[in-house]
């Protein structure tokens, strides 16, 4: 468009115009101290984040338990959830999937390496209500349309407003 914006719309206006659904945002504070983690390429080192979120034993379990308890506190009916959980690494997505399954919340995970047929099957299972969550890493920030998604879990920090809004948008479709 010769460096001209054809149209621009902000989140509040899109909600007011009923292009996106209104939402409730719940911030849950965990007890994980990230102060000592290395900073790499404008964010926390993903390898270090992955270790603390998956391999730190009681810390990782306590954080995952906090997520499950908060979910059960704020969600009216867990059987109606169709959610995405954004994770920092393949190990983190697998850990969260396993933890949710162990706590009676049917879940699966996908990564950037998951073949299209697996992604399609996962989407169908979520829409059909066979699973409550798909935990993802390096996919579904954009380019996926699952209007049935009604819950988004931000399970990793991001310094990018663009990525945050893209992930939030996965749960705002009408």
Regions found by a protein language model. Give the residues of each.
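Conserved helicase core region in the C-terminal RecA-like lobe
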Residues: 135-140, 152-159
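Conserved helicase ATPase core of P-loop NTP-dependent helicases/translocases
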Residues: 84, 92-141
């Amino acid at each position: 468009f010769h460096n001209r914006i054809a149209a621009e719309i902000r989140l509040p206006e899109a909600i007011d115009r009923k292009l996106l659904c209104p939402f409730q945002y719940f911030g849950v504070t965990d007890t994980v101290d990230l102060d000592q983690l290395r900073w790499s390429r404008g964010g926390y080192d993903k390898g270090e984040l992955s270790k603390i979120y998956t391999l730190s034993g009681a810390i990782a379990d306590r954080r995952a338990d906090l997520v499950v308890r908060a979910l059960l506190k704020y969600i009216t009916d867990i059987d109606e959830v169709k959610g995405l959980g954004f994770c920092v690494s393949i190990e983190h997505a697998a850990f969260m999937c396993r933890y949710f399954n162990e706590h009676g919340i049917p879940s699966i995970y996908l990564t950037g390496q998951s073949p299209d047929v697996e992604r399609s099957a996962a989407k169908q299972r979520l829409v059909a209500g066979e699973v409550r969550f798909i935990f993802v890493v390096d996919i579904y920030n954009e380019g996926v349309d699952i209007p049935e998604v009604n819950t988004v879990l931000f399970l990793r920090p991001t310094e990018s407003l663009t990525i945050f809004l893209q992930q939030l948008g996965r749960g705002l479709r009408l």
